[in-house]
Structure formats: C-alpha cells, structure tokens
A protein has these predicted regions:
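Short beta-strand/turn micro-motifs at beta-sheet edges
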Residues: 37-40, 101-106
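Vicinal oxygen chelate
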Residues: 27-42, 47-56, 104-197
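Core segments of cupin and vicinal oxygen chelate
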Residues: 28, 43-45, 53-98
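Acetyl-CoA-dependent GNAT
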Residues: 97-100, 167
Length: 197
C-alpha cells in the first residue's frame, strides 16, 4: 500500500471555518435552542458513516484495530493518519496523531466521546470478536444484554470507549403495552455467547 500525501493544513482550516460559522450562527440566532425539534425528522436512511479518533501512537492503534479487531487498513498517510474498514468500505474508522502524538488520554470527568459502537451482523460474528479479544488479553469493561442487542464494552489503547454489539431481529425486541421499545441492561452470559464460535 502506498502512503498518499495528506493536505492536513487545508483539511484542518476547512473544519475550523465550518465550526466557527456554526458557532457564530448558534450564538447570534434568534431561534431558541430547541428549534431543531420543531423541524421534520431526519431521513431514516441516514447512517453514521465513520468515526475519526485522535491517538497517541498510530502503529499501536493499527495493531489494535487491525491486529485484534480485524479491520483492514485501507489508506495510510505516513506516521500521521490511517483509515481502516470492514468489507471494502473506504473507511469506518479514521486514526490520526495530528494533535495527539504521545499524548495521554483525556482525564476522567471531562466531556468528549463516551464510546462509539461497532455493529456486527450476527451473534456468531460478535462471539468471534470476543474470542479475538480474549486471545489478545484485552479486558472488557462490561458485557450486557439490552434486549434489543447483546454488547461488549472495552477501551482501545488510547482510552476511547468502544461497544461491540449485534442487534437481535426487530420482531424480537422487547416492547411495552404501547408497543414502545423497552430496553434493559442485564449481565451477558459470555460462555453462552462463545458457544456460537
């Protein structure tokens, strides 16, 4: 794979211009902060396409996301950035060290990312992810059955929270008397999950 030059300065400048414009519009808008709720709902086909993470060591992050979780490296920009994906997509996860090389994780009790979630297509695929984690001696922060899904919780080497999960078929989701989804949190039986492998 050939490393492509990455116009980092232009990219960052563009993001800053967008953020400044958005912040200015929000501060000087006559609309109330809840105006978004008065608009029509977002198109239901919209999906979150990728997450981009600041990491302290690009190689350490690639070792985790590609080596442990099994993502494919789709593009690398020297020692500063990389894209990884599943199934040939251009990228599901971006990794960069632009402002974070050798930096510690943010302290607890601050705002920022709580976790991002990676959706597996089947229970067997989630079980295989658990097997990979166990093989690499990666500790879990939690494992839950939410009724609609089964989930594993962990942190990457930079302290970013990750949820690995699969969704049960919609017709099996728990619902109340008014047919509203009724999620819960119960301990996930990891031995039972591993029986899928």
């Amino acid at each position: 794979m050939v490393a492509a030059p990455f116009p980092r300065g232009a990219f960052i400048a563009r993001i800053l211009r967008i953020a400044l414009r958005f912040n200015t519009e929000m501060r000087f808008s006559n609309r109330s902060p809840d105006y978004v709720m008065k608009e029509k709902a977002i198109d239901p086909r919209v999906r979150i396409g990728h997450v981009h993470l600041k990491v302290a060591s690009l190689q350490r992050a690639l070792d985790f996301y590609c080596g442990v979780l099994g993502f494919e490296l789709t593009q690398r920009y020297g020692e500063e950035a990389a894209f990884v994906s599943a199934g040939g997509y251009h990228h599901h996860i971006g990794l960069n060290t632009w402002e974070s090389r050798d930096a510690p994780p943010p302290p607890k009790g601050t705002t920022g990312l709580y976790h991002f979630a990676i959706l597996y297509p089947t229970r067997a695929a989630l079980a295989d992810a658990l097997r990979r984690l166990m093989q690499a001696n990666v500790s879990l922060a939690g494992a839950s059955d939410h009724g609609v899904s089964e989930a594993l919780y962990l942190s990457d080497p930079d302290g970013n929270g990750i949820e690995l999960y699969w969704d049960r078929p919609r017709e099996l989701w728990p619902r109340d008397a008014n047919w509203q989804i009724e999620m819960f949190t119960r301990q996930l039986d990891l031995e039972n999950l591993l029986s899928e492998v």
